[in-house]
Amino acid sequence: MNEYGCNVCNEEYSARDPLKCPRVLTGCGHTICHNCAISIAGRNSSIFCPFDRTATQIPGGDLQNLKKNFALLELLEKIADGGGLLEKSGEVVKFDRYSKERLLNLECDEDSEHVAVIYCTVCDSNLCERCSESTHSTNVLSKHRRIPLTEKPPPLVHCRLHSSYVVEFVCKELSCDTESPLMCMMCRDYGRHKGHSHVLIEKEVEDLREKVREHLGELSKQSETIGNALHSIDSVIHELTPGQEDGSLEETRQEVRNHFRRLRTALDRDEEDAVETVDRYARNRVESLQTQKERLEAISSKIGNTCTTLQKALIMERGKILDRKDDLLALAESTAAEPTAVLDQSQLSTRIAFSFLNDRKLHIGDFIESRVVLLGLDGAGKTSIVRRLKKVQMDTVMAPHPTIGFNIETIHYKNYRLNFWDVGGLPKLRHLWKHYYSNAQAIFYVIDGYAVERFSEAIKELNRVMSDPLVGTCPVIVAVNRKDGYALNGHMDALLSQLEALPFQHHFHCCDAATGSGIDQIIDQITVCLSRLNGTCPV
């Protein structure tokens, strides 16, 4: 707050805002704003001064009837109208009516060490106050019209062909092939631009300046976006730079070391290998981010240079700015067209994803290979499920013929690369199943939910597979493939009872190969089981 504000709320007084109007407490003479008077008085018929507690009666019970501090209001209006500043010199208050002109910092034409604040319209000269008085002290010169420098009219541009005429128009004729679009009245009525469409030079200049302002606004936003991106990149680089105690890299290194300290002494070598893996990953990330940073810095520098050029263009004379119209607009448009895509939040994450498997090796950012065998009777929908996972079109999801032999499809899910082995389910092929599930990490067994009469056969084959010692601790997911909303009446309960009676653990799901419903949940269950089996550390 300056010295012209309310000492209660520290807000400046205003002649335009009713709530900031200065009100005089007649009981003591102090002044507060109208808004503070409302807060202090409440519904009372009197108001107590917040400075000396003197009571002032509110005329008619309405705070609007409290006297305004007109002296202060008049002073505020003078400051607003004149654009000047009030300065205290000892006990004397001095009003500077040329404060705006001083900000221009133009040299006085009489004395270059002085700052010009006045313009003489007759002499066409910029003068300081002292030189203005000294040079116009005679009776004749004192009649010259002198105005504040901020009110100086723009310089007139004279026609190149008719030097005694002032340029007043700009040619807008598309077929005009003259050197300059600027025209005076002679050019318009009798010269090269006769009959051409045209506009006033003031309008053309203002339109051009408006376009420049729009480009400046857009470029400022782009510059701000790039600035934020650079700040984020610097933050991530700081987090991933070795030696930064508060960085994510150091936190990850410490977690890795803590893990290996809990292991036997023989794991020391593996610990150092793991730390090197983290460092190498961080170096690669930093190199990639440095490349992105350099690209954005180059664009930011170009935008800054363009903005500087456009800012200078705004204060050019009319003729000069119009002469450079095409160059200015081309520069602004080419700079605005620069790609300013920034990294998304996932690319700026400082977390380092890692996991430990049974081989005691640290894995970062690589997919874990896993073999999943799909088993089931012929026609159960195994191939349709795999094709649905591969995003095959709807009309080709359902396989018209049973699988002869096997198909292999690879699905990427989370940090796993799941190799699905779709094995044929014809009776003559079932004795070959053991050659596929013997090396499997998971078994996905599919039952046709429409073939109720084959439920017992499907359960029998599943029990035969799980009784094989080759299966071992391999997780089993059992899925009933049926259409959503398809009623099995009491057959589903019977199927669940048979599954619960099996002497091994399994995970039960329902899915629809035609629509893909429920398949994502099954794949998620498979990866959860694989993570438990592998002893993967949570990321």
Curated annotation (Swiss-Prot):
Residues noted as binding GTP in the record, renumbered to the chain: 376-383, 422-426, 481-484
Judged by the first EC level, this protein's enzyme class is: transferase
The protein's UniProt keywords, in alphabetical order, are: GTP-binding, Metal-binding, Nucleotide-binding, Transferase, Ubl conjugation pathway, Zinc, Zinc-finger
Q: Which SUPFAM superfamilies does the entry link to? A: B-box zinc-binding domain, P-loop containing nucleoside triphosphate hydrolases, RING/U-box
SMART domains, per the entry: ARF, BBC, BBOX, RAB, RING, SAR
ZnF start-end (RING-type): 6-53
Q: Which pathway does it operate in?
A: Protein modification; protein ubiquitination
The record's Gene Ontology biological-process terms are: intracellular protein transport; protein ubiquitination; vesicle-mediated transport
Which E.C. number(s) belong to this protein?
A: 2.3.2.27
Q: Where are the zinc fingers (B box-type)?
A: 103-149
Segments of this protein annotated with the region ARF-like: 369-539
Q: Which GO terms of the molecular function aspect are on file?
A: GTP binding; GTPase activity; transferase activity; zinc ion binding
Catalytic activity of the protein? S-ubiquitinyl-[E2 ubiquitin-conjugating enzyme]-L-cysteine + [acceptor protein]-L-lysine = [E2 ubiquitin-conjugating enzyme]-L-cysteine + N(6)-ubiquitinyl-[acceptor protein]-L-lysine
Q: Which InterPro entries match?
A: Bbox_C, E3_ubiquitin-ligase_RING, P-loop_NTPase, Small_GTP-bd, Small_GTPase_ARF/SAR, Znf-RING_euk, Znf_B-box, Znf_C2H2_type
Assigned GO CC terms: cytoplasm; lysosomal membrane; plasma membrane
A Pfam family recorded for this sequence: zf-RING_UBOX
Spell out the PANTHER family in the cross-references.
E3 UBIQUITIN-PROTEIN LIGASE TRIM-21-RELATED (PTHR47156:SF10), PROTEIN CBG20824 (PTHR47156)
Q: Which family does it belong to?
A: In the C-terminal section; belongs to the small GTPase superfamily. Arf family.
Report the protein's function: Acts as an E3 ubiquitin-protein ligase.
Protein name listed in UniProt:
E3 ubiquitin-protein ligase arc-1
The root-end lineage is: Eukaryota, Metazoa, Ecdysozoa, Nematoda, Chromadorea
Protein's gene: arc-1
